[in-house]
A protein has these predicted regions:
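N-terminal beta-alpha lobe that positions the nucleotide/phosphoryl donor
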Residues: 1-162
């Protein structure tokens, strides 16, 4: 599996309607407008996180139970809240951060914005938190219960420049 599937430069991701704020910023960067330099952790990266962390298995199990999706999502979040990002995804994130060469970064998703991140462990924790958002997990449990593919979403990591 190629680690470059996990990370793209802002402006190189492609424009999907359901990419939310990340998709809008990517579109602006692709159009040549001035936006912060950044990198996008792709939907493929999110899929890898779900698979390697065990979240995918837990979401499917929760969907089969047919209980309240919000409660199930909270339980899944609690079980995986300290899961370390590992393997190929970890390497891809570390290499991308080195390439970004920013002292302070922000992680942005549809449900989360965490700034003032100064270390690789802080960034990886924010990535995990974004992919374990309660709202996102609830949507995944509901989709699995309907027999649909689990929704995934990209994350933007960009330099937090002082203006």
């Amino acid at each position: 599996m190629a680690e470059d599937e996990f990370v793209r430069r802002l402006g190189e991701v492609g424009h999907w309607q359901d990419n939310g704020r990340v998709g809008i910023l990517d579109l602006l960067a692709d159009a040549g407008l001035l936006v912060h330099e950044g990198l996008v952790l792709t939907r493929r990266a999110h899929e890898e996180f779900l698979r390697t962390s065990g979240v995918l298995r837990d979401v499917r199990t929760a969907a089969r139970r047919g209980e309240d999706a919000r409660r199930q999502a909270a339980q899944i979040r609690s079980r995986h809240a300290s899961y370390p990002v590992e393997g190929a995804l970890n390497r891809a994130i570390c290499e991308a951060l080195i390439g970004l060469n920013a002292r302070v970064v922000v992680v942005l998703s549809e449900d989360l914005e965490k700034g003032s991140l100064r270390s690789v462990p802080e960034v990886k924790d924010a990535v995990r938190d974004a992919w374990l958002s309660l709202r996102g997990l609830e949507r995944q449990v509901e989709a699995a219960a309907r027999g649909e593919d689990l929704p995934t979403w990209p994350l933007l990591v960009y330099s937090q420049a002082k203006i």
